Amino acid sequence: MSSFKTKVPQVGRAQCSESHLDASSLMDSGGDKKSTFRKLKPPTTKIHIATYNCRTMRTDDHLEELEEELRNIKWVITGLCETRLPGEKRTTLKSGHTLYQNNSETNYSQGGVAFIVHRRIEHKVTKYHSISDRVIYLVLQINSRYRLQLIHCYAPTSTAHDEQIEQLYEDIAYAKNLENTHYV
């Protein structure tokens, strides 16, 4: 037992027999990859984004089924396609989540897009706007410096006319250029 060193050797103090065991003398200088005192990263929040083709949400039963299914997955924002809900509006659901929807008033038997935003981050939504019954976007204020723009689209099938596909691409480009955000 007497062969163990009880004192930590100090560089440049060969004459002095005293060892300094206080925290400041044992602190790592930070030059190595395996530094013991690393700077802590600021806390981050993960945004879980999901998409779902619901085929219809005309009745309240369909909406309740969707809310029940969302309880089983991790999500913060869910983009919905083919909702078939009339009009462009913002609705607060029974669960406290918010539904942002868009479809034409006259032809709501097909198409329609929407976002469901979790009640935890609903206060971060600064703007939502629909370009057509196939394209909608949402702007989130991530922090005091950055904003995030989410564009959700319902693409036509491969058998659709080229005009419909070109119109979709034009709508997406228009939505992208409409907002001045750091991230899209």
Regions of interest found by a model, annotated:
Residues M1-V184:
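A shared catalytic/ligand-binding motif for oxyanion handling
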